[in-house]
Amino acid sequence: MSSILRPLARHSHESSVWYSGCRSSSLPSIPATTARSPAYSPSWRQIRHNSQTPSEVLPSRPKQSSPRRTTVLAIALSGISAGLGYYFAHTQIAWDAASSSTGLSNKYGTPGDFERAIQELRTTFGCKDAVSTDPNILHVHGFSENDYHPGSAPSVVVFPQSTEDVVKVVKVANKYKMPVTPYSGATSLEGHFRAPSVGGICIDLSGMDRILEIHEADSDLVCQAGARWQDINETLKEKGIPLFFPLDPGPGATIGGMMGTGCSGTNAVRYGTAKGEWFLNATVVLPSGEVIKTRRRARKSSAGFDVTKLFIGAEGTLGIVTEATIRLTPVLPTTVAVVQFPDVRRATEAANEVLRQGVGIQCVELCDDEFMKATNKYGQSTRKWPEKDSLFFKFQGPTPRSLKESAEIARRVAEKHGGTGFELARNEQEAADLWQDRKNALYSGLALLEGSRGWSTDVCVPMSRLPQLVYETKKDLEETGLVSTVVGHIGDGNFHALLMFRTDEDLEKARHAVHRMVERAIALDGTCTGEHGVGIGKRKYLYEELGTGTVELMKSIKRTIDPYNLFNPGKLYPDNRPSAEREPQPKLVKPRDT
């Protein structure tokens, strides 16, 4: 086991300054954001924790009662307890339901409470730069260039360096009933780190980016939540350790955020998603301020619930992950091939058959004709691409021979389904160049419409229904007058669209088109999000996708763990009633025969 006690290499200067606990610049303060409602009295949970009687003052043991009397008393007490439990549980649920549209509490502290909380945070952390109310910093932590959901700034941003620091912040938040929003890589596309309208505390975990332990013999690694997956893999490579962490969402994504959104990426067809077995355990600060470690480091365990997974996909609403143990996997040789098809249906059929052959596939990506046109226009490729629906394969295997065999099987299957121009990289550099064209999806897409911005979204359907989804969505966008590229993790039915727009009018068109795409995916037995998460943007679809029982169970878990709804309020959990402006279900169009 080697212990890495330095920050990751991505900002060596910045990280070393973080280690000292303070930054050099001083930041002016501004008043806290106004709150809407006063705090309310402590819950039963607080009473329980604060009323334990020391053993030395416990009452003496009473005289032994007769068995019959004991039985009658037990039955009576059971009835009373059940009745009170039912009353308080249902009273609390009814009270919560009346307090917000989601059925979760929204009774936060007053503006004065928030001011006192900020002052206590400054006193607790001492260093001015550990607690900031600088307007620019608040804006960065409440708004995003990655999406077009409404922004809202926090009242204060705190920069912890350890789990203990996070606990201190959460205890202050509890004391003053101040909402808490976790923040790290800021790569979210669905508004996950927006502050609630009342303001609150933003906990910026980006400074907690250290690798704490590497266990090469066990193929795992312990790191803080702010560590970025790319930096982790680069560190392993620099140390000559032939292992890597295979989840590959957007550049800059951190381990904490990846857990929170249940992310994946292009490698999902081979390695699965964050909801698989890639996170062995996590250190989590609960809304009460209690710290738990979800399990030990064994590769598998059947001891009780898999508590780690409770926090994967919870989007910071149940707890704040501060450390995690992640599984690593061997680095194997890879190569890349590209092939063109007459249409998406035949490309999908070819990809499905290749996967069923058991070929060593690490990634298989669908890029539509508009994407290939955009790649040519972007001008960064080493070649001129045929502007047709295409598949990008990344093959993986232990030897060069195994890679060639996999590529040959893929070529034969592709040609069987009408594929043409199969091109296999001749060396590592050519493979890197080919794959880079796929990774440039955002920038090449924006080149398709000069001066445009882009709305990126994702849905996922069973693989057999992906051609129908792509066809209907492209037809919809064409009729709407929007320019878009389509990229899909075709091996698992995950479909991404980048909708370009220049004007506010086109932005609204894009917003409605995304809504129709989501409704279409759910109607095809799919999901509103394959890997971006729910956040603000997709929460209204959960009742339709998951059903009332499942959503209410999620809310019950939330109320139990976070009765004050302090952790990341406004995300994930949908309103109790459907929106009055909800659009009708789109008509499904039968795909053309091609």
What are the functions of these language-model segments?
Residues S2-T594:
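Noncatalytic alpha-helical scaffold of FAD-dependent oxidoreductases
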